[in-house]
Amino acid sequence: MERFKAMRKWFVLLLMCMLCSTLLSCSDDDNDMRDVAVSPERLPKVSKDFLSEYYHGVKISSVVIDYDDNVMVYDVDLANGHDVTFGPTGEWVEVDAPEGETIPSGIVPEIIVNYLDEYYSGYGVNDITKTGLGYEVELVNNLDLVFDAQGNFLYIENL
């Protein structure tokens, strides 16, 4: 009888452990890091310098610290509708203008600008994103072009 009580205790303990394990694995904790609105003063100096150079006089609407693929980024919304994403060290990762508008030309690397002038003259850059392999550039006509890290054209993405 004592042996039966001891086995029952172990069985109940095992059931409770399994239940706790199941409940914890189903919890909504896969995004522990939440978006946090912060003051523009919290931006790294590199980001502030970028905004001052390319968006001088444009008011910052909001700054949010976000985690994209567990990497901290600063998402900055500007009063003119442009959005700039900065990496953890403050370097720009993406610059996006509203539909039909262009981003400031000085942001795009010169070799890419030269390519666009030759092959897509008259179509400004609506969005540019730094990727692990180079750059993705969206033109105002919604054509997506991919360039390597040196700015050499690779392919058209959405054909």
Each PLM stretch: what is its role?
Residues 2-4, 35-159:
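First exposed extracellular module after export/assembly in secreted or surface-exposed proteins
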Residues 2-13:
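Bacterial N-terminal signal peptides that target proteins for export
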Residues 12-20:
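Hydrophobic helical h-region of N-terminal Sec-dependent signal peptides
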Residues 21-25:
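C-terminal motif of bacterial Sec signal peptides marking the signal peptidase cleavage site
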Residues 27-30:
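Bacterial signal peptide processing site
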